[in-house]
Amino acid sequence: MSYQFIEVSSKEQLDKVFAFRYEIVCEKLGVNELDYCESGRETDEYDAYSVHFAAFDEAGEVAACTRLIHHSPIGYPTTNNMEYDTVTWNFDQDSLGEFSRIFVSPKLRSIEKLKPLFNSLKTIGNAKMVDLNISYTLGSLEKPFFRLLRILGFPYQRIGDLQSYVGLRYPCIMYTDELHSANPEMFKDTSVT
């Protein structure tokens, strides 16, 4: 079965996403310092400013998820929790977003399964970034995941040193136009305004 990301469009789907996040974050990763793991759901203050995406299996269960935080009046996980040179990396808040809570079921963690899954995320994520006028997208990425995303055609750049934030992570940025350049076969007719 080939999995495809879709935009979460119902409370039932969103509840399944929060339960999947709980399973991955709170149970499998053993991250107990998060304040928002309760009642079998993992949520946080950024969810209110997010568009959620998920891939569902044939039984309707979540196999992968992420969110695109946008136009957040409370900032972003990367801006609020990581250090980077804010003079060099000064972003227009009206054009800024952040992909976070990118989780994939262990059954999909082979490169053969990840490629089509993340190609679908590029397609739907790009459409939403263009629709929301997002020119750049932050991410707090672990070193192996940073490398994997670049292999999969997500041209994130490190904007700071490796630092402790729910494990060791780099603050990163991805420009929407560079996502298009890195994937010309997918975005040949796309332009960012």
What are the language-model segments listed below?
Residues 1-42, 47, 52-62:
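Short amphipathic alpha-helix that is part of the acyltransferase structural core
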Residues 1-14, 123-131, 178-179:
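N-terminal short leaders/motifs
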Residues 2-3, 48-50, 63, 94, ...:
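Sequence-level motif detector for i,i+2 pairs with an aromatic at +2
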Residues 57-60, 107, 175-180:
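Short loop segments at secondary-structure junctions
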Residues 59-89:
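Short, His- and charge-rich active-site/binding loops that engage polyanionic ligands
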Residues 79-170, 174-175:
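Acyl-donor binding region in acyl/amide transferases
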Residues 166-187, 192:
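C-terminal "cap" of GNAT-fold acetyltransferases
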